[in-house]
Amino acid sequence: MNPSDIETIELLSPAAPAQAPRPLFILLHDAGAAAVDMLELGRLLGDAFAESAGLLPQGLTGSAADGESLAALAGRVEALAAYVRLQQQRFGVLQSDTALAGLGAGSTLALALGGAHDGLVGRVLAFGGGYAVWPAAAPALTTLHLLHGADDSVASVARIRADFAHLMELGADATLDVVSSAGHGLHPAVMDQAVTRLQTCVPLRFWKSL
């Protein structure tokens, strides 16, 4: 898959500089869904971060959430990594100023990239999804935000709590927010909490550098 050939919806604010928008958001749709399904989140992030740019690629997640082999997932991770690097170079954006968000299978892909390519993005926001396989080590240069609906019937909140507990055992820089009365998908309260995390949560790596 050539990263330059991936169909992408672009949300570019007039207030954002032509080069080095901050942050650069890349939003991954769920399996079997479409990039347009991430528009509401993309617009919310654009309103909250006036100098940001949002990219919504089509098809990187694939068409099936369950049953995908680990080898297939690894292939998608590498395709995503190539896409992220291309866009960072295009916009002149630092890795630390890049945030990768995903819904469902998109969040599984985003978390897998965070483990395979530590620091390629500064933050991962995982909505309604978790790990395909637990990582053996925590990323040192990527902050992880798990955001979940308490009534999610696709990915149980118990599973996501277990993911988070494992991350804490590894010493990861991670947060978990469970929103009551929210199911699977981009519930407004879940999206609002994501914005709050982005605006208020200083990555642990910055504190350690002081």
Residue ranges and their predicted role:
Residues A158-L210:
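C-terminal catalytic histidine-bearing segment of alpha/beta-hydrolase fold enzymes
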Residues Q58-G62, G130, A182:
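Short beta-to-alpha linker loops that shape the active-site pocket of alpha/beta-hydrolase fold enzymes
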Residues R22, S96, P139-L144, L170-D173:
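Short, proline-enriched alpha-helix->beta-strand connector loops that line the catalytic pocket
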Residues N2-V93:
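Serine-hydrolase catalytic machinery in alpha/beta-hydrolase-like enzymes
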Residues S96-L141:
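Primarily recognizes the serine-hydrolase "nucleophile elbow" in alpha/beta-hydrolase
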